Amino acid sequence: MLYFAYGSNLNHFQMKKRCKDSKFLKKIKLKDFRLTFRSKYRAADIEARKNSTVPGGLFEISKSDERKLDVYEDYPLLYKKYYFNYYGKKIMTYTMTKKTKFKYPTERYLNVIKCGYKDCKLEKKYLLKALMIL
């Protein structure tokens, strides 16, 4: 199964620890979505936004990995699954079930994401824009 990570799961160390079978394939961009931070947990989320882009990491994961991600993402309470096609391939990601106002992430959580951006060689401008710094 193909999985699109855009938040803390971009971090290769964390992803491998959580999902032992996972393999990072490449960086990709999800068009017409934007990255934001929401909920009392101040967690990363994506929402539809015309002419916006969310960079992320494409991972191959096993069924066992998917079950572990479901637990981590508090599926189906906090996050729901969202599927999209990318060059004919079906890809799964998570998006929050309840959209709340923007909440700045904790420093610890943000550092995990920053490491993930580095691991996946993503442009930080997207993260800075989501944090309302740009």
What residue spans do the PLM features occupy?
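Glycine-aromatic micro-motifs
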Residues: 1-134
